[in-house]
A protein has these predicted regions:
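Nucleotide-activated sugar donor-binding and catalytic core shared by glycosyltransferases
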Residues: 1-16, 21, 26-164
């Protein structure tokens, strides 16, 4: 329940609505626990990709366990819509985004999460948005992929499929 306690504390500290995209299993667990969310916390069905990205662009901060948060944060920074991005995880598949300071890994405990949100919001307010990850803003990705795949067809056929 420390995550929900942290959400309530964020609502109180920043005195603004918090949209909690709540998976049905999480909603059920929350109801069974009897935990009461702050009145500023709005429980919502999971959002589609477009709606979620529109919300991110206009958010005070984004706190999420989504594995795509690093890419989204980097992309929106590159197009002039940076937002404080805080990931509720203990590791990431995208260390390159962490290296460019596009997002924070907050951990999963209340104290670390609240500290990460405070730091991310303050840095964002001071104009410190991190740097977009160069690999995420490549313009000709499909061309590169086609050329790479085509370049390895002969090797894969020979080494994997034993076609000579």
């Amino acid at each position: 329940m420390s995550l929900f306690t942290a959400i309530n504390k964020m609502a109180g500290k920043y005195d603004m609505p918090i949209l909690y995209s709540c998976h049905p299993r999480s909603r059920k667990r929350l109801e069974q626990s009897g935990f009461i969310l702050d009145k500023r916390v709005i429980q919502h069905e999971p959002l589609g990709f477009h709606d979620y990205n529109c919300l991110q662009m206009n958010a005070f901060a984004v706190v999420s366990d989504s594995g795509t948060l690093p890419e989204e944060s980097s992309f929106f920074t590159s197009v002039g819509h940076p937002f404080p991005a805080i990931c509720i995880r203990t590791s990431t598949e995208r260390p390159e985004a962490l290296d460019k300071a596009c997002f924070f890994i907050a951990g999963i405990d209340e104290k670390s999460l609240l500290q990460a949100v405070d730091t991310a919001v303050t840095m964002n307010q001071n104009g410190d948005y991190g740097i977009p990850v160069p690999d995420y803003i490549e313009e000709n990705v499909s061309t590169k992929v086609v050329k790479i795949i085509q370049s390895y067809v002969g090797i894969v056929n020979k080494m994997v499929w034993r076609k000579f």
